[in-house]
Amino acid sequence: MKNNKKKYALVIILILFIAFFSSQCMMTRTNTESKKTVAVILPYTYNKENSRILDAIRDYAYNNSIILDVWHEKSLSSNKLASIITKEEQNHAIGILLIYPENYLTQQEKHYDYDNVLAITATMQTAFSHYATFENSPSPSYLLPVSARVIKKIQDGKTDCIYIKNTYKLGYESIQMLDTYSRNNHMKDIYIPCQKVDKAAIESGKLDALLTN
């Protein structure tokens, strides 16, 4: 009798274990399937500008359950780009983000007509159907972060003002646009205004968070 009770107990434990394991597998599969993928193609060599753009892209991806498929390219022909885009579409990527393609595309005179591609670019706006860029601003313009030496010149009156390019914002709004495109199938160009920084703006403290990043 005791042996039968032990057998029943073992069977119940085994059933509970199988049920728990199955539920965990289903949860893992559901969580994986719910995540979206964005392909990011960027120059092989990092610099301050690319780094802050990528930081923003990673932050948005983390906060919105997006997987990033990152490509580092030294040189990329139009055929190789088409091949990458086809591969990413087959993997159900919601979009492809090109970071400064002028630094790796070998055929810059072509028009790259892709609805699901957004190019962050300073010089190739006409080459893409959709792009993100900074608005034109009077010089001098600086990338964030701005050095303390430059800020001090403004505070001392040696420089009237400068204009800063927020590359983090550029990257963040770019991946956000691709995410939005995946839901409503509508993409539009992005223009990020340059922020004017003068003595009054610095002394007001309104730009503290921006300038210290």
PLM features per residue range, with description:
Residues 115-128, 136-158, 197-198, 202:
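Venus flytrap/periplasmic-binding-protein-like
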Residues 34-38, 148:
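Nucleotide donor/acceptor-binding cores
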Residues 2-15:
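N-terminal Sec-pathway targeting helices
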Residues 22-35:
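Sec-dependent signal peptide cleavage junction
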Residues 146, 169, 173-213:
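Hinge/cleft segment of the Venus flytrap/periplasmic-binding protein
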Residues 74-127, 135:
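Beta-alpha junction/loop-to-helix N-cap segments that form part of ligand/metal-binding clefts
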Residues 51-54, 58, 78-85, 105-109, ...:
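Extracytoplasmic/secreted envelope proteins and their assembly/folding machinery
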Residues 39-56, 60, 69-79, 101:
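Extracytoplasmic "Venus flytrap"
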